[in-house]
């Protein structure tokens, strides 16, 4: 943070013998501090600029206050002509190798955890998709088995009816008796097939 000015030649001349500040009767303490500040030469970061005279902002404020109290015609901005704000070079502290290594280790751990989280989500999605397709395959197979069972039931009942109707002609001469006998046999066969079919469906539902 800036706290000083690089004094310009105008301020140095004004404070010297016969300078513009001589008639202003500066307080002894203020003059001594200003002369001490301007007398010290500091070597700045840029060696081409040579030694630099640094004046603190506090001294500049005290000088400004004194000039205002005396109603001086000498303005501060005129005295500061050629002066610049001094910005000290920021020296970066050396990084702790232990801390750097620890930060790198934490960074790698975080990257690995993020990678595992992403791949875990992908694996879960693949498993869910695989489970859905497997369930769909089971449902299709169950539906196919049900259709075949119903078809076999109908074929068996019809075959029982036809066989009984044709075979009963040697026992019954009337068509009504032959039809009744065929219906009775077909019903018995149908009930037996229905019982077997229901038991088979219960077993399949139990497996699901």
From Swiss-Prot:
Superkingdom: Eukaryota
One GO BP annotation of this record: intracellular iron ion homeostasis
InterPro entries, sorted: ATPase_Vma12 (IPR021013)
Signal peptide: none
Predominant subcellular localization, coarse grouping: membrane
Positions carrying N-acetylalanine: 2
Subcellular location(s) of the protein: Cytoplasmic vesicle, COPI-coated vesicle membrane; Endoplasmic reticulum-Golgi intermediate compartment membrane; Endoplasmic reticulum membrane
GO cellular component terms given for this protein: COPI-coated vesicle membrane; endoplasmic reticulum; endoplasmic reticulum membrane; endoplasmic reticulum-Golgi intermediate compartment membrane; lysosome; vacuolar proton-transporting V-type ATPase complex
Keywords for the protein's UniProt record, in alphabetical order: Acetylation, Cytoplasmic vesicle, Endoplasmic reticulum, Membrane, Transmembrane, Transmembrane helix
GO MF term (any one): oxysterol binding
Subunit-level organization: Accessory component of the multisubunit proton-transporting vacuolar (V)-ATPase protein pump.
Stored PANTHER family: TRANSMEMBRANE PROTEIN 199
Function summary: In aerobic conditions, required for intracellular iron homeostasis, thus triggering the activity of Fe(2+) prolyl hydroxylase (PHD) enzymes, and leading to HIF1A hydroxylation and subsequent proteasomal degradation. Necessary for endolysosomal acidification and lysosomal degradation. May be involved in Golgi homeostasis. Binds 20(S)-hydroxycholesterol (20(S)-OHC).
Stated name of the protein: Vacuolar ATPase assembly protein VMA12
Taxonomic source organism: Pongo abelii (Sumatran orangutan)
Chain's gene name: VMA12
């Amino acid at each position: 943070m800036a706290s000083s000015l690089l004094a310009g030649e105008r301020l140095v001349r004004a404070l010297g013998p016969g300078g513009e500040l001589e008639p202003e009767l500066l307080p002894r303490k203020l003059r001594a501090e200003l002369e001490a500040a301007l007398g010290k030469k500091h070597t700045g970061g840029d060696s081409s600029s040579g030694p630099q005279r640094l004046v603190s902002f506090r001294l500049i404020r005290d000088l400004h206050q004194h000039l205002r109290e005396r109603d001086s015609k000498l303005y501060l901005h005129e005295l500061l002509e050629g002066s610049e704000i001094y910005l000290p070079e920021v020296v970066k502290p050396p990084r702790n190798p232990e801390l750097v290594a620890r930060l790198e280790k934490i960074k790698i751990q975080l990257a690995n955890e993020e990678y595992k989280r992403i791949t875990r989500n992908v694996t879960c999605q693949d498993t869910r998709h695989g489970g859905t397709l497997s369930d769909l395959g089971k449902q299709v197979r169950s539906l196919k088995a049900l259709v075949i069972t119903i078809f076999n039931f109908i074929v068996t009942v019809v075959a029982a009816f036809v066989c009984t109707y044709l075979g009963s002609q040697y026992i019954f001469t009337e068509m009504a008796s032959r039809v009744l006998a065929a219906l009775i046999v077909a019903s018995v066969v149908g009930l037996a097939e229905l019982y077997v079919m229901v038991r088979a469906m219960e077993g399949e539902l139990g497996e699901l």
